[in-house]
Curated annotation (Swiss-Prot):
It comes from the Eukaryota. Heme b b562 binds at residues 83, 182. This is Cytochrome b. The chain crosses the membrane at residues 33-53, 77-98, 113-133, 178-198, 226-246, 288-308, 320-340, 347-367. The lineage of its organism: Eukaryota, Metazoa, Chordata, Craniata, Vertebrata. GO terms for molecular function: metal ion binding; ubiquinol-cytochrome-c reductase activity. Its cofactor is heme b. A ubiquinone binds at residue 201. It comes from Eubalaena japonica. Belongs to the cytochrome b family.
Length: 379
């Protein structure tokens, strides 16, 4: 008799995706991040659900409701900090997952890659609206500054901003709709993640060499389920260490002050995972130019498959491209650091150089290095 997991309509889907899935035998730990992202998403949805049971999306009570969660709700403090630091872990996994895709040429699976770019935008939107909910100083001013960027759009800008605000400033209507967005978006992310997997399973996974591995596949279970469990344990350990020993390490102290429209914080800055984009935005002295650069800094990922000029898929055997890839990583870390610094002399010019280098690397230097490597292969 055939096993039920291979015949039952629902079990068959799970079986084909997580049990009998043919997987390359040589994929490294860099391929763990996909499952870790799934784990992060589930944890965020669950902790978020329990937080939503006690949170009130109203300007007068939002801040107090967070205090109430931390002080009066059973284990409310740990749920709140797991959710806040879970977002940081989510972005760490997300950036590692994208870095892996860039390094090993996974973007050659265009449908999977494009859904991934849409997923990135959706996760960033979710994190942004979520940061507004505690209604602290940085929540309020972050929302004001970022939504105000839309006013740079010619002709419709101001109308658009007021439409998003639901009034003439960030207020009660804004908070209520941001809570609604923050609740619905994770489920949209979940649906997109399933589509992402669907497209991936059409082609099968890439591997470190970038060479087709159809002649050397192994079942996902038990080999990669065990490997993924190890990654999951490390992720949970890191998250618990962060949550229990340094819950506010990645947060902003300004957000412990209730929102006050009459007092602007000295340095308005987003959470650490947006600082690189914020630095690119600030490096251009023109409002519209800055907004376009900000948008392009993420949207450029969609053009990566078109910028691939190498005859090899992976960077595994391409030393020049490898060097430029790590320069790009260093550049992004520099931008992240600059984004958290005040707008004054040494930081401004360093941020401008780093921003130029970011676009130069992706649009010019890396495609050129690939062409040089193609020539060297003929020697």
């Amino acid at each position: 008799m055939t096993n039920i997991r291979k015949t039952h309509p629902l079990m068959k889907i799970i079986n084909d995706a997580f049990i009998d899935l043919p997987t390359p035998s040589n994929i490294s730990s860099w391929w763990n991040f996909g499952s870790l992202l799934g784990l992060c998403l589930i944890m965020q949805i669950l902790t978020g659900l329990f937080l939503a049971m006690h949170y009130t999306p109203d300007t007068t009570t939002a801040f107090s409701s967070i205090t109430h969660i931390c002080r009066d709700v059973n284990y409310g403090w740990i749920i709140r900090y797991l959710h806040a630091n879970g977002a940081s872990m989510f972005f760490i996994c997300l950036y590692a997952h994208m870095g892996r895709g860039l390094y090993y040429g996974s973007y050659a699976f265009q449908e999977t890659w494009n859904i991934g770019v849409i997923l990135l935008f959706t996760v960033m939107a979710t994190a942004f609206v979520g940061y507004v909910l505690p209604w602290g100083q940085m929540s309020f001013w972050g929302a004001t500054v970022i939504t105000n960027l839309l006013s740079a759009i010619p002709y419709i800008g101001n109308t658009l901003v007021e439409w998003i605000w639901g009034g003439f400033s960030v207020d009660k209507a804004t908070l209520t709709r941001f809570f609604a967005f923050h609740f619905i978006l994770p489920f949209i992310i979940l649906a997109l993640a399933i589509v992402h997997l669907l497209f991936l399973h059409e082609t099968g996974s890439n591997n470190p060499t970038g060479i087709p591995s159809n002649m050397d596949k192994i079942p996902f279970h038990p080999y990669y389920t065990i490997k993924d469990i190890l990654g999951a344990l490390l992720l949970i350990l890191t998250l618990l260490m962060l949550t229990l020993f340094a819950p506010d390490l990645l947060g902003d102290p300004d957000n412990y002050t209730p929102a006050n429209p009459l007092s602007t914080p000295a340095h308005i800055k987003p959470e650490w995972y947006f600082l690189f984009a914020y630095a690119i935005l600030r490096s251009i002295p023109n409002k519209l130019g800055g907004v376009l650069a900000l948008l392009l800094s993420i949207l450029i990922l969609a053009f990566i498959p078109m910028l691939h000029t190498s005859k090899q898929r992976s960077m595994m055997f391409r030393p020049f491209s490898q060097f430029l890839f790590w320069v790009l990583v260093a550049d992004l870390l520099t931008l992240t650091w600059i984004g958290g610094q005040p707008v004054e002399h040494p930081y401004v010019i360093v941020g401008q150089f780093a921003s130029i280098l970011y676009f130069l690397l992706i649009l010019v230097l890396m495609p050129t290095a690939s062409l040089i490597e193609n020539k060297l292969m003929k020697w």
